């Protein structure tokens, strides 16, 4: 593995430990007890279990870091500057329906900046990770955004209800974290979506940036109702024109 920080190593170990429980639960999906959390957002025992494992591992290593997570919200600790941002299962609905497209997402926010992040797809065993000024990687191999420069040749990812993307070639996968990871490694050429939570995209933000992509400025003090437009540099302005009313 290329040289990584102690904090990123902690994140990798936490995600790998949580993934073992997720894979077991995914194999017995019909036995999961699910409680309704919102009209299109369901929380499962697997989600809660994975988050607990991740938080325990992170706290063991850095007990004073604050935590922002999907299930527990913001847990302020002595160190308010550094915050772990956790989504134990991004793509929960896919997971609950037996669709093997979901991921663990963990990022570290220092003040108002994401400085490291990982997105782990336990089914495909793909670990995407990045650190500030150190590049983006997939399973120890450096990754870059695509070099497409014609918007008609591109494939984009989006999610939720959108009204302005009809003339863009796009896919809706149900997993924002993997959508952004796929932009970072060139599988998608861009990603756009409304109404995101910070834990959905925190790791993806640094992955795209470190892979050479462009994103609109994001207020890191805001944790909900985020809008993301991310893409390869050569089509960024054209994509923004297409999404002028997005």
Language-model segments: what does each one mean?
Residues 144-246:
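An extended, acidic
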Residues 48, 71, 88-91, 122, ...:
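Generic detector of well-ordered alpha-helical packing
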Residues 138-142:
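A structural micro-motif at secondary-structure boundaries
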Residues 1-89, 244:
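N-terminal subdomain of lithium-sensitive/metallo-dependent phosphomonoesterases centered on the IMPase/IPPase/PAP
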Residues 28, 73-74, 136, 162-163, ...:
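Active-site/binding-pocket entry motifs
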Residues 78-137:
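DPxDG-like acidic metal-binding loop motif
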Residues 18, 22, 47, 58, ...:
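Residue-level signal for inorganic ion chemistry
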Residues 15-18, 136, 204, 211-213:
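Small-residue (primarily alanine) positions within well-ordered alpha-helices
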């Amino acid at each position: 593995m290329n040289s990584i920080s102690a904090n990123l190593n902690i994140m990798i170990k936490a995600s790998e430990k949580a993934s073992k429980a997720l894979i077991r639960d995914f194999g017995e999906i019909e036995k999961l007890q699910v409680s309704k959390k919102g009209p299109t957002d369901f929380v499962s025992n697997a989600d809660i279990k994975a988050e607990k494992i991740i938080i325990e591992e992170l706290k063991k290593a850095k007990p004073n870091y604050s935590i922002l997570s999907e299930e527990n919200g913001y847990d302020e600790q002595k160190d308010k500057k550094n915050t772990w941002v956790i989504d134990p299962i991004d793509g929960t609905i896919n997971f609950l329906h037996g669709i093997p497209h979901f991921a663990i997402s963990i990022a570290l926010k220092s003040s108002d900046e994401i400085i490291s992040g990982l997105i782990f797809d336990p089914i495909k065993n793909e670990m995407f990770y990045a650190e500030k000024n150190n590049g983006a990687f997939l399973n120890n191999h450096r990754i870059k955004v695509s070099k497409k420069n014609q918007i008609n040749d591109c494939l984009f990812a989006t999610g939720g209800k959108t009204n302005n993307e009809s003339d863009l070639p796009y896919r809706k996968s149900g997993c924002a974290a993997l959508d952004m990871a796929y932009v970072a490694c060139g599988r998608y050429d861009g990603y756009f979506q409304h109404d995101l939570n910070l834990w959905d995209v925190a790791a993806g933000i640094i992955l795209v940036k470190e892979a050479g992509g462009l994103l609109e400025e994001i207020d890191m003090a805001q944790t909900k109702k985020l809008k993301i437009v991310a893409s390869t540099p050569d089509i960024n302005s054209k994509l923004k024109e297409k999404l002028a009313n997005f």
